[in-house]
């Protein structure tokens, strides 16, 4: 088994690196120029402030510009944004890293230059085919261009905000909380009483994963640094391991599900502390320009056919029904938000820099309210 795994792993690595190199070479053949239809504002059109990402690079490539205010298509909703949230998804897209992702996001420059994804705001107008929302509704969801005063989205990518939930708290949910929910429910297939370990319990996804796993009846162990131990415990974790003092992969406890946002231990190390038919769900991993966090999932995919345990990558998808479920958890008091820092729209580059450091406790918010 080990020999077949190593051969398959090597072949797939060669293919992945070749594709990545091809994408990188092509990326250097294209100039980074303003996209047509964005820089040019129609005469008499309304404008708005928006953060724009025209080129791959550091946060310095992000610019705050006046662009044309969007109008909703027949199946779209126009929302005035009051708050947005930062995710690793944003800065991976900003840098075009790992390079392999450029095959989808654009080789020479980003295809989608409106920046940001998580939003919360008030519906201003709806297309004629929209039935789920109406003008004045408070909504949250995920759509391209969240770091702006307005955006349009399709109604299946959002849900109503409960009356007692703030725009900032609602904006914190979409990518991070949906990733946690789908990882635990769909990939982890958690059952009441199972032992679940969350590696990276103090981050954006991790803080939600701890709470959602508890709401599903699991016995939860959270992994975090010393300064976050009490915070993770306050979210409901039954056990908290300080990774600066103890290595969970060297302990005697066996876990039914491990959700990993960090990628600081090998698959074999994690397998040692998994139950015989346990599940290992990869959400994040170590940085790197070539394959980055994709290296772990590639190895897991190759290993899966040869073992009883299940290992794989979690790729979340924005879903209005899941957002509504998260809203219900908040209404019932089973899900709360940890906000680390707040930034204004003009400070988005600073927010991205802080997110890239990898030490945020919970969520980073972009506030558009006066």
Stretch-by-stretch model annotation:
Residues 70-85, 99-145:
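Glycine-rich beta-strand-centered segment in the early N-terminal region that forms part
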Residues 249-257:
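A short acidic, Gly/Pro-enriched loop at the edge of an enzyme's catalytic core
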Residues 265-335, 368-370:
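Glycine-rich phosphate-binding loop and adjacent beta-alpha segment
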Residues 2-12, 43, 317-370:
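C-terminal hydrophobic helical "lid"/dimerization subdomain
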Residues 2-42:
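N-terminal membrane-anchoring alpha-helices
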């Amino acid at each position: 088994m080990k020999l077949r795994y190593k051969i398959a792993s090597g072949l797939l690595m060669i293919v992945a690196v070749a594709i990545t190199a091809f994408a990188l070479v092509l990326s250097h053949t294209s100039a980074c120029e303003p996209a047509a239809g964005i820089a040019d504002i129609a005469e008499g059109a309304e404008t708005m402030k928006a953060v724009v990402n025209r080129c791959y690079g550091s946060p310095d490539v992000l610019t705050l510009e006046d662009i044309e205010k969007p109008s909703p298509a027949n199946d779209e909703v126009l929302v005035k944004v009051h708050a947005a949230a930062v995710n690793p998804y944003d800065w991976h897209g900003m840098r075009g890293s790992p390079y392999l992702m450029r095959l989808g996001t654009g080789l020479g420059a980003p295809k989608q230059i409106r920046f940001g994804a998580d939003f919360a705001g008030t519906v201003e107008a709806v297309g004629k085919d929209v039935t789920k929302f109406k003008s004045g509704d408070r909504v949250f969801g995920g759509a391209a261009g969240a770091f702006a005063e307005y955006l349009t989205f399709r109604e299946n990518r959002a849900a109503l905000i409960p009356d007692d939930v703030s725009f900032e708290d609602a904006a914190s949910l979409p990518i991070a909380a949906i990733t946690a929910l789908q990882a635990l429910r769909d990939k982890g297939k958690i059952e009441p009483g199972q032992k679940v370990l969350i590696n990276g319990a103090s981050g954006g996804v991790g803080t939600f994963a701890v709470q959602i796993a508890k709401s599903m009846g699991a016995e939860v162990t959270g992994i975090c640094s010393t300064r976050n131990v009490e915070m993770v415990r306050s979210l409901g974790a039954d056990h908290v391991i300080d990774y600066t003092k103890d290595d969970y992969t060297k302990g005697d406890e066996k876990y039914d599900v491990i959700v990993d946002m960090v990628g600081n231990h090998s698959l074999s190390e994690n397998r040692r502390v998994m139950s015989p038919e346990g599940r290992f769900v990869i959400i994040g991993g170590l940085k790197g320009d070539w394959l980055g966090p994709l290296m772990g999932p590639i190895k897991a995919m190759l290993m899966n056919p040869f073992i009883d345990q299940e290992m794989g990558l979690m790729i979340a998808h924005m879903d209005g029904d899941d957002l509504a479920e998260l809203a219900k958890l908040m209404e019932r008091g089973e899900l709360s938000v940890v906000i680390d820092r707040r930034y204004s729209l003009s400070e988005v580059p600073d927010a991205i820099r802080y997110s890239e450091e990898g030490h945020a406790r919970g969520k980073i918010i972009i506030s558009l309210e006066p």
